[in-house]
Amino acid sequence: MEMAVANHRERSSDSMNRHLDSSGKYVRYTAEQVEALERVYAECPKPSSLRRQQLIRECSILANIEPKQIKVWFQNRRCRDKQRKEASRLQSVNRKLSAMNKLLMEENDRLQKQVSQLVCENGYMKQQLTTVVNDPSCESVVTTPQHSLRDANSPAGLLSIAEETLAEFLSKATGTAVDWVQMPGMKPGPDSVGIFAISQRCNGVAARACGLVSLEPMKIAEILKDRPSWFRDCRSLEVFTMFPAGNGGTIELVYMQTYAPTTLAPARDFWTLRYTTSLDNGSFVVCERSLSGSGAGPNAASASQFVRAEMLSSGYLIRPCDGGGSIIHIVDHLNLEAWSVPDVLRPLYESSKVVAQKMTISALRYIRQLAQESNGEVVYGLGRQPAVLRTFSQRLSRGFNDAVNGFGDDGWSTMHCDGAEDIIVAINSTKHLNNISNSLSFLGGVLCAKASMLLQNVPPAVLIRFLREHRSEWADFNVDAYSAATLKAGSFAYPGMRPTRFTGSQIIMPLGHTIEHEEMLEVVRLEGHSLAQEDAFMSRDVHLLQICTGIDENAVGACSELIFAPINEMFPDDAPLVPSGFRVIPVDAKTGDVQDLLTANHRTLDLTSSLEVGPSPENASGNSFSSSSSRCILTIAFQFPFENNLQENVAGMACQYVRSVISSVQRVAMAISPSGISPSLGSKLSPGSPEAVTLAQWISQSYSHHLGSELLTIDSLGSDDSVLKLLWDHQDAILCCSLKPQPVFMFANQAGLDMLETTLVALQDITLEKIFDESGRKAICSDFAKLMQQGFACLPSGICVSTMGRHVSYEQAVAWKVFAASEENNNNLHCLAFSFVNWSFV
């Protein structure tokens, strides 16, 4: 034993001696050994035990090093690598924080100047008021500001306008020319994209943003000047004239057309001067403002479809940062001529929050997105480049905007659709689906059926999220299959379809998203199976390319969209797209604004009359603010390819389908409204039915009256809302059905919805007989007379069927009549209620 220990010490001593340099200091590895280890580390930073042993055998200069030592070397090497990366990251973060701190200090200085200015103005106004009160002989004198007349047709005049635009823009971006207030819901912080503000008490609507972007100033300016690439509402932008300004800058005359967000108002266009220059401090500026005069552009007929809007001094101030990157200030200041839209839409055109979300915030987010992509921070699946996916999103959005606006110069013309006065139907015979490889094309085009609706008390983000996640609640699979089949044929001809059953399953496959997840691009696969016996094993799946935006409920003024188009399962980059979808825009209603959409110049459909989600007339005065302040405009547009000889048939199908979608949206809106069907808030369950709280009381009271026992254990001090909550959370499945010849369910508690595997929206399509098997239906029929005579009936244990086809067993079912507690009539039968006790899936 002693000999073994001595041998081990001798080997250790020899090993250490081999790693002493000429000065006697301990050196763990020689330069040759380190070089060999570095080569292996470059190939595999974390080699396994077998790989390390193999390394010792293959590399003779490492033969005298123990495997454990090599393991420790690789561990230390990985730690040093991690430390270097972390140090580099911290330096980058420190630079960003320093730049952000500088930005915040400047913002603080600007706010202090603004406060001082307001204090001075307040003191001056008090002094003037005192003078007027004390000196009644004082006459007010109105002075009109005098502007020097400049010739906008000469370079000298344009340069004068450009310099004035620059001064006005800088005073808005970094000064106090506009009274800025923080954008609601966009509190600045470490995780924020930037600092956002909107105007208060100024001419028009304005928004401002400033933030840090890891791109060079020239690159940022180039991106932002290409407005159609990031501003989804920009239809076209054309530079008519460009000439040097003489000071190193450039002056451009620009004509821009924008889309209208709904079918209810005309689109806007702008005729502007854009001035690009650099400042003495190294900053880069792009500023822009409207010019007087028509400046209609190359096509006067096209310009006649637009209302000329005004752009007040706006633009971008881009300052380089130490260590790379830039600080950017963005100002958008517009006058959208709200007088030209229906009263119900005016708040949309007078909202700085909407301009902030659509333009200012979108611009900064887009720049940040490109910066992250260029730095390799964004990785997308399916091998798609970010630029390709971004192009798909832009094409979907542009195609939907084209359909909603239906510009004549794009080939759109309006046709009449019999029996659908609330739906606009337009056709476009200039659109072609066939690609270059398919030389055969049929005469036809694309038909669009569209409508706009006013909804109340429906959060746009919640509505769009529901439509995305529950497509089967509103969509017809056969219509999707029709569009997909037409797309595969590569022409307008309808190739024919075999009978297909939709399985009810949709699979959403994400492709990419923006940095803050405000927009998602995805492929949706709708699973279908042929009903024909010879094709029983063939897949009839339908694939849709889809973008979903604005599902953040906290984004004030944000537009929510769900836009989709059928696409080939091979998903080629140049795939033709015929988009359809939904757009929901919040409208900040003003008190006293009661003008509804029927006064609009365009045909529309007002769902509010049938939703009945507002307060009752006797309570309207107490809730006037809530009933008028939460409104949104829903725009629906669906496009269908057609062949000329089938135009009328496709138009009829399109009208019928859009009407069906509208009806489904109506039910969805009723269900998801915060003042709709909810355990905590009373509401109308359906047109003509009582409020949820009242119905819960009727169900409980009628049960006690007929069976002599309590359905719910209610505290003597419990409120009316607690009755609804107890009913909603009851362990037994409780359902109510109407007294029509074919009873249809109108309400169910949570257990009832779970048992039927359905939602409150789809519940109203389920009849009573659908949920029972044959024996259950016989039991209902045999006890129905008893139920109607004595007011209740107890059904034996049995089996019922969920909407998904699953069997559900229950120990007992109790049915009873529900009476409406009315002062005039105590025997007012309202509906039938059922309670399924101890139910479970078989």
From Swiss-Prot:
Start-end of Basic and acidic residues biased regions: 7-20
SUPFAM superfamilies, sorted: Bet v1-like (SSF55961), Homeodomain-like (SSF46689)
Resulting phenotype, residue 630 to L: In strain: cv. Nd-1
PROSITE patterns noted in UniProt: HOMEOBOX_2 (PS50071), START (PS50848)
Example of a GO MF term: transcription cis-regulatory region binding
GO biological process: cell differentiation; determination of bilateral symmetry; meristem initiation; polarity specification of adaxial/abaxial axis; radial pattern formation; xylem and phloem pattern formation; xylem development
UniProt-listed CDD domains: bZIP, homeodomain, START_ArGLABRA2_like
Tissue: Expressed in the interfascicular regions of stem and vascular bundles of young roots and leaves.
Listed Pfam families: Homeodomain (PF00046), MEKHLA (PF08670), START (PF01852)
Keywords assigned by UniProt, alphabetized: Coiled coil, Differentiation, DNA-binding, Homeobox, Nucleus, Transcription, Transcription regulation
GO cellular component, as recorded: nucleus
DNA-binding region: 22-85
Outcome following mutation: residue 190 to L: In avb1; gain of function. Transformation of the collateral vascular bundles into amphivasal bundles and disruption of the ring-like arrangement of vascular bundles in the stele
Region (Disordered): 1-20
Induction text: By auxin. Repressed by ZPR and miR165. Induced by DOF5.1.
Summary of the knockout phenotype: Plants display strongly reduced auxin polar transport in inflorescence stems and hypocotyls. This phenotype is probably due to altered cell differentiation and morphology. Repression by miR165 suppresses DOF5.1 over-expression mediated upward-curling phenotype.
Role summary: Probable transcription factor involved in the regulation of interfascicular fiber (cortical cells) and secondary xylem differentiation in the inflorescence stems. Required for lateral shoot meristems (LSMs) and flower meristems (FMs) initiation. May be involved in the determination of vascular patterning and organ polarity. Directly regulates the expression of AGO10, ZPR1, ZPR2, ZPR3 and ZPR4. Required to regulate adaxial-abaxial polarity and leaf axial patterning.
Record text on subunit structure and interactions: Homodimer. Heterodimer with ZPR1, ZPR2, ZPR3 or ZPR4. Interacts with ESR1 and ESR2. Interacts with ZPR1, ZPR2, ZPR3 and ZPR4. Heterodimerization with ZPR3 prevents DNA binding by REV.
Similarity field: Belongs to the HD-ZIP homeobox family. Class III subfamily.
Name by which UniProt lists this protein: Homeobox-leucine zipper protein REVOLUTA
Organism: Arabidopsis thaliana
